[in-house]
A protein has these predicted regions:
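Active-site neighborhoods and metal-handling regions in enzymes and metal-associated proteins
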Residues: 1-596
């Protein structure tokens, strides 16, 4: 079934169901950014594989909105018959509907794939249209029997040695935030986000590629001072004596996954049901509104997300260890790649093979649990595709005379990593050196910054961009995102003030379509720099040397040169003892950390 046939079938089904238009989100019932293969509806219907897409199909057009990270990629991927729309640069989906569809037109959308917040915004803006819940998802009906199945792998218990907190302690933390000191004796909190559930229960899964989570809903309950979690899940995942005892010890009561709606409907007169608009899907919200007993209370944010974003001391030390492991692995990787491309002058090496080698060197590390996202290894023009994803059938050959960008990460029991380095093994152009240096200066300026408490990531965002602004350039992605603890590599909350204990990335970049791309990414920890003046700053956790071959010395002050030299000395001091039995990697590290 090709793309043209899929669209034809979809439009036929739309006519049968009375839909003038249909909205397709990238997502699932749990508000996941990264989704299981069985939920990749946008990819199935349009061939676009990015993690942010919003589609609209009518009888005349098929449109796909995405953000700046994917502008280059989406042009290459969309099936014929689809048209790209640029988020924040062109009219929004809602504006397109207002400008092109008659009032009263019927629009179908699967309510279970939209959060309360996003569905409400669509319905409010399109209030003169008939918005219908497509309960038998139209894409799934086209997909039919060839749709992939959801995984049923067993769960992993993550011990307190790695989490730093028992489940019972997390129950107390969550209760304190929910009740805000009030004596509320009978409540339940609906938890939909999979990483929230995994964090709360100190459990990990493998239902979604690269994300150690498992499909489930949870009701965190308090009744007369006693806590428990009702977990709605495929029970096969916990069908071991060890897991049954763990659930009993931590007051986890098991239900089948599809029992969440009936259980929600069993409210009590004096019970409060809490939920948050950002993660609860709209169909679930419709169920909550129909409950006649008890009280429904909307939360202003995802409280578990807020708590888990502030890492405890055990988790922080875990991130430090995970990043050292990753730095060791990546020194081995880059030294291998240099030898293959320069010393051996190989011309048969491709991006896909590079990605496989990157995974191989990490697998040598203790407590390695897998990659944290699909490796991005782009050479030359492919480096300009921000979320480029090479594979066995789609890749380019490596070339030592072109820029090579490697954005990769790993899952360790101690923590999650996300690191990007850009290298060049030949003679870079002056433009490449200038733009690399500007990106590096932006990265280091953010890392060295001290700022008042209360500042958000957004409020600091202009600082790493400033060296690009000087020459009229910018990049179309965020500079930072939170990172989960052996959880999702992208973690919220977004827009809240930075707090000591937050782990975030620092990743400015520059991208020139059909030419080259640059990104430099470290993980950093928010720390207190001056307690008396309430000044915060960052502790860098990533120890991979910068690409001296791409640094334009004329653009860097002596102060920055010293800062880079000091950083390179740290790289040598921390990594050289761990590489003493690998002469090739040790020699590479020594050369790359020599004073500028």
């Amino acid at each position: 079934m090709d793309g043209k046939e899929k669209l034809h079938i979809m439009r036929t089904l739309m006519k049968e169901r009375g839909y003038d238009a249909y909205i397709i989100p990238h997502g699932d019932c749990h508000d996941n950014e990264y989704i299981a293969e069985a939920d990749e509806r946008i990819k199935f219907i349009s061939n676009f594989s990015g993690s942010n897409g919003l589609g609209l199909v009518t009888q005349d057009v098929a449109l796909m909105w995405t953000d700046g990270r994917y502008f280059i990629q989406i042009e290459k991927e969309l099936y014929p018959g689809w048209q790209m729309k640029k988020m924040r640069e062109e009219e929004s989906l809602a504006d397109y509907v207002l400008n092109n569809l008659e009032e009263g037109a019927t629009i179908g959308m699967d309510y279970s794939l939209f959060s309360v917040d996003s569905a409400s915004r669509i319905k409010d803006k399109l209030c003169k249209y008939s918005i219908v819940d497509d309960k038998n998802n139209i894409i799934d009906d086209i997909w039919g029997t060839i749709k992939p199945k959801y995984k049923t792998n067993k769960l992993l218990i993550l011990s307190e040695k790695f989490t730093g907190k028992k489940v019972s302690e997390k129950y107390e933390m969550l209760n304190k935030m929910l009740t805000k000191g009030d004596d509320i004796e009978n409540y339940r909190l609906l938890v939909s986000r999979l990483d929230d559930i995994a964090w709360l229960l100190n459990l990990r899964g493998s239902d979604i590629p690269y994300n150690p989570v498992f499909f489930s809903y949870a009701l965190f309950c308090k009744n007369k001072g006693q806590f428990c979690t009702k977990l709605f899940i495929n029970k096969e995942k916990l069908d071991t004596p060890e897991m049954k005892k763990y659930c009993e010890d931590n007051h986890i009561i098991l239900f089948n996954y599809d029992e969440i709606i009936p259980e929600l409907e069993k409210s009590e007169e004096n019970m409060i049901t809490f939920f948050d608009e950002e993660s609860t899907n709209y169909r679930m919200f419709q169920t909550l509104k129909e409950i006649n007993v008890g009280r429904i209370s909307r939360l202003d944010q995802d409280y578990i997300e807020v708590i888990k974003s502030i890492k405890n001391e055990v988790e922080i030390e875990g991130y430090r260890k995970a990043n050292i492991k990753d730095s060791v692995a990546l020194i081995k990787f880059f030294s291998w790649m240099e030898e293959e491309l320069v010393t051996k002058n190989r011309t048969d090496l491709n991006e896909y093979q590079i990605g496989l080698k990157n995974k191989e060197v990490r697998e040598e590390q203790e407590n390695y649990m897998g990659e944290s996202f699909a490796p991005i290894c782009g050479c030359g023009a492919n480096a300009a595709i921000i979320h480029y994803e090479q594979n066995e059938n789609l890749h380019s050959d490596m070339n030592k005379n072109l820029i090579i960008l490697c954005d990769t990460g790993a899952q360790y029991k101690e923590g999650t990593t996300d690191i990007t380095r850009t290298v060049h093994y030949g003679k870079p152009t002056q433009k490449e050196k200038e733009m690399y240096t500007r990106v590096l200066l932006g990265n280091l300026s953010l890392e060295r910054l001290q700022f008042k408490s209360g500042k958000t990531l957004y409020s600091l965002d202009a600082i790493p961009r400033s060296y690009l602004y000087m020459v009229g350039e910018d990049y179309k992605h965020g500079t930072s995102h939170g990172v989960g603890h052996f959880l999702n590599v992208h973690e919220g909350p977004h827009g809240l003030p930075l707090i000591p204990g937050n782990i975030i990335t620092n990743e400015p970049g520059y991208y020139e379509k059909d030419n080259f791309g640059i990104r430099i990414e470290n993980e950093v920890l928010v720390v207190v720099k001056n307690e008396e003046k309430k000044l915060y700053g960052f502790e860098n956790l990533t120890f991979i040397p910068y690409e001296r071959n791409l640094i334009d010395m004329d653009l860097i002050s002596n102060d920055f040169k010293k800062y880079i030299d000091d950083f390179h000395k740290q790289c040598w001091d921390k990594l050289s003892p761990l590489l003493k039995n690998d002469k090739k990697a040790l020699d590479y590290l020594k050369r790359k950390t020599a004073p500028l």
